[in-house]
Amino acid sequence: MKKIKISPSILSADFSQLGKEIKRLEEGGADMIHVDVMDGHFVPNLTIGPPVIKSLRKYTSLIFDVHLMISPVHKYIKDFADAGANLITIHPEATENLKESLDLIKSLNKKVGVSLNPKTE
């Protein structure tokens, strides 16, 4: 039987203590760390960018499951890959060419994810 993987989000973490929060998740059995990236444009909220993700790498070797809620997403994929994302999830609505963006993620040796909005036509 396949093992279920746990990927808790750091969105509700204390952003002034992210290193400690990630250590707590790791000690609690997390398999991955889910990072919600929001730009205040594609979605109304604003969170973190590549420099923060890069700075968190020193606290864990767990997979960073980075969910990009930004537009235009294609422009920033490499920045997040270089910062330490292992899995990059994007929204079709945030890119002009979904296949091209997914191919870019794969070319950077990262796993890909697509987040679907049921209301999108």
Language model: regions and residue ranges:
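Conserved N-terminal beta1-alpha1 strand-loop-helix module at the mouth
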Residues: 1-89, 93-97, 104-110
